[in-house]
Amino acid sequence: MPDFKVTRYRLRIGSEKRDLEQPFSAVFLSDLHNASYGEGNSRLLQEIRNENPELILVAGDMITASSEPSTDASIALMGELTKQYPVYYANGNHEYRMKQNTDKYQDAYERYSDAIKSLGVHLLENGSARVELYKVPFRIWGLELDQSYFRRGRTAQLTSSVIEGLLGKPDEQCYNILLAHHPSYFPAYAVWGADLSL
């Protein structure tokens, strides 16, 4: 199993909406595929604690849709994270595949989503949550795309109007953070109106 990678970015959060004067930090997680780094994900959790974030942002594929999907490591990780931080989670293609293909996966996705929501995870399935940090309003959006947007070599074209059909319009009163699993569609995310896409 490959090790996890920590990359730090410093971004200036400012727009015509409002400047954020006080710095804050967020941890962004994606594509762990139910991996565990140390017993109970102890290495990953320690690295996250070292960053001292105000919130955790998750852009999917925390589990793997395989013939025998396992979600235990991801559920345990979410349980530890929600003890200390607010967690905002958007599905990736693996979660979506499990959700849609109930013939193959039965109720595995429903059990997974119920478990993480019961722990306090804000699961954003084409939805959003409003958050205020240092008196600045943020809206965190979770974009969930169907499998046609993830097929290798023949992906569907994503447009801002498709995103608007799924999410509605960005909140003009807030700084809009879009959690979207597929980075190739960044131009459509920007046209839709995301101030920051992850």
Q: Residue locations for each model-derived region?
A:
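N-terminal active-site segment of His-dependent metallophosphoesterases
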Residues: 1-77
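Generic enzyme active-site microenvironment
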Residues: 28-29, 59-60, 90, 124, ...
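Short, conserved loop/helix-junction motifs that constitute active-site signature segments
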Residues: 50-51, 78-84, 190-195
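Metal-dependent catalytic neighborhoods of phosphoester/phosphodiester hydrolases
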Residues: 38-44, 60-79, 96-117, 190-191
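Short helix-capping segments at alpha-helix termini
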Residues: 19, 80-83, 116, 171
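A general structural motif
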Residues: 23, 53, 84, 173-175
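Conserved phosphate-interacting/catalytic interface
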Residues: 87
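Conserved catalytic scaffold of divalent metal-dependent phosphoesterases
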Residues: 15, 32-34, 95-196
